[in-house]
Amino acid sequence: DLYPVRPVRAGVPVGHFHASRPEAAGRRAAPEHLHRLRTLRRGLSDRLGPARRLSRGKSASRGSRRAFLAQMLALCRSRRSNRAFTSSPVPERALEMIVEAAHRAPTASNLQQVAFTLVTDPDTLRRITAFTVETFASVVRKLENPLLKPLLKVLVGGAYKYLPNFHRLIGEYGEGRDLILRGATAVLLIHTPDGSRFGCQDSNLAYQNASLMAESLGVSQFYTGFVCSAAGQAGHGLEKLLGIDGKIHA
């Protein structure tokens, strides 16, 4: 239900930004403010050729190879979750590079079923936060229900240690503070079709690539664990909210 609108700029053939088409054949169009990026199959030109040559020792001196490896290790060491965001949007070019890095991650059996949905619309970002908080509020009501509590303590006793965190998130949200997305101006959701056997693993490999690229670009980022947890608790609720076919993993 999506069609390519334009390729990623600067000749980067890693995927296409997609937008929704009008309603047709009973299919729901995806919201227009979502950038949908789907991976392409083999046959892409390789922008990482120089780095690969360095890693293989071709066309490079030992000194430059050592420098490359040192820089790579320094990047891995410097990667941090950083929730201190400004209100400025992330440059589109930086977002494109982050998505390309994610796309370059390996997938099980080279199936390449991983897809990416980039959300930059402020209202939709607020809806993601609201969905997450409401999901946790529902969990709290169940855990604290006096009729269910004896059974739940046996079945999911470990969940009760998270109650203080849930109450804090809900309370802060009620006072106008977002501890879910922390005021982020963009969220990249990584998902695969339902039934993808290694969808979770593939998606999290893609996340790590994206995380390292964001670090190298000086873009503050963190893993949205609360959002992923809420998505897992609520069936396909978040996917339906965002018009995503499949399951969000990262």
Model region roles, listed by residue range:
Residues D1-A250:
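Acidic, surface-exposed loops and disordered segments
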